[in-house]
């Protein structure tokens, strides 16, 4: 006899509803599960009995019967990052409109945690999975879901060797444009700062573990190289997850006059450290970033950013996934959405 753990009362079962509606258990199950045939009069009696008794469907039982859970899993890299909060909201808006619940899990950008999250979602029998992959170059943690024919869509990043739909922003073009703004202002000693883990100093041609960061670095380095800056890769700073202030201090000591932050959290840490060091933005150091976080428009000065269509990235990923769940067998899609420059007051010519 199932008991509700919250109030200690016996849970209302399909059998209870069937008895109250004076129909068979199989008929009540069909009506409550939304499958099979039943007359309108029978449906009305069953639904009225269910409402009167306070019946709540057993999600697992419904999944076993219909093969669908009407749920979607989403795995993000860092739930504290505003990017993932907005992308998740976009996915949730589309999922809700289509009748799906969303289950959110965090990978902390680690493949092992991502693999565990995949296992949890498969155990919950989700109908499909959205993932911002922890690694572009080694997506082995995602293969179980693909091998089990569970629809999957990647967002924000791609993953080598996985034939699945992807939705990303045009990070290559966005980085080139940010770098060009600084070059046009007269800067030559421009640094790019990211928290992505990387074993060695950055070298041109080396793939980074996140395709979004890799595209940004390549766009940044390409713009500087085209402008004749000698060995622009030497200005790329990685592995700053726990040490953005230390990286900024070293850059200032090295005579850097401008910084491109790979996301708004890095930009915020850099902004604070420059203030701590007594450096004025943009008079002493220019600062630009990816992502139009709220603080970038409220700070003094406002920060020039490359705004990503974050809500739309999540929403489009969910749309693609729901189409796959419905059986769409079209070739996989790689959707690239444009970014938008928000020009504020954080760029000035370098001091002579």
Feature locations, PLM:
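Alpha-helical recognition/docking segments in bacterial nutrient-uptake
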Residues: 1-15, 44, 59, 67-184, ...
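Small/polar loops that bind or transfer phosphate-bearing groups
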Residues: 30, 75-76, 106, 130-133, ...
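Short beta-strand segments enriched in small/hydrophobic residues
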Residues: 20, 27-30, 65-79, 189-206
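Bacterial carbohydrate/catabolite-sensing allosteric modules
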Residues: 2-6, 52, 93-98, 147-154, ...
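N-terminal helix-turn-helix DNA-binding module of bacterial transcription factors
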Residues: 1-70, 348-351
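Residue-level preference for short helical/loop micro-motifs built around acidic side chains
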Residues: 36-40, 112, 283, 312
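Non-catalytic, surface-exposed connector residues within folded enzymatic/regulatory domains
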Residues: 11, 39-43, 58, 66, ...
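Hydrophobic packing within well-folded, soluble alpha/beta domains
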Residues: 14-23, 28, 38, 46, ...
């Amino acid at each position: 006899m199932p008991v509700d753990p919250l109030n200690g009362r016996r849970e209302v079962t399909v059998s209870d509803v069937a008895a109250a509606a004076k129909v068979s258990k199989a008929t009540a199950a069909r009506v409550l599960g939304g499958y099979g045939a039943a007359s309108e009069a029978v449906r009305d009696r069953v639904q009225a009995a269910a409402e009167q008794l306070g019946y709540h469907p057993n999600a697992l039982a419904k999944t076993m019967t219909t093969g669908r859970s009407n749920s979607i899993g989403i795995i993000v890299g860092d739930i504290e990052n505003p990017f993932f909060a907005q992308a998740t909201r976009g996915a949730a808006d589309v999922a809700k409109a289509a009748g799906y619940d969303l289950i959110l899990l965090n990978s902390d950008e680690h493949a092992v945690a991502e693999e565990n999250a995949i296992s949890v979602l498969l155990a919950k029998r989700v109908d499909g999975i959205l993932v911002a992959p922890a690694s572009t170059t080694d997506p082995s943690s995602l293969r179980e879901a693909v091998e089990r024919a569970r629809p999957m869509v990647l967002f924000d990043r791609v993953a080598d060797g996985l034939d699945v739909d992807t939705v990303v922003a045009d990070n290559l073009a966005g980085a080139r444009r940010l770098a060009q703004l600084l070059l046009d202002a007269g800067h030559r000693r421009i640094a790019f700062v990211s928290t992505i883990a990387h074993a060695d100093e950055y070298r041109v041609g080396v793939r980074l573990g996140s395709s979004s960061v890799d595209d940004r670095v390549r766009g940044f380095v390409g713009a500087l190289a085209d402008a004749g800056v000698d060995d622009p890769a030497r200005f790329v700073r990685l592995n700053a997850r726990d040490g953005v202030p230390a990286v900024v201090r070293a850059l200032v000591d090295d005579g850097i006059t401008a910084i491109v932050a790979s996301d708004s959290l890095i930009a915020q840490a850099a902004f604070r450290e420059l203030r701590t060091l007594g450096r004025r933005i943009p008079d002493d150091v220019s600062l630009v970033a990816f992502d139009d976080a709220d603080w970038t428009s409220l700070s003094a000065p406002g920060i020039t950013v490359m705004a990503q269509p974050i809500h739309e990235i999540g929403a489009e990923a969910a749309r693609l996934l729901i189409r796959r769940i419905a059986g769409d067998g079209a070739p996989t899609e790689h959707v690239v959405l444009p970014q938008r420059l928000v020009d504020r007051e954080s760029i000035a010519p370098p001091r002579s």
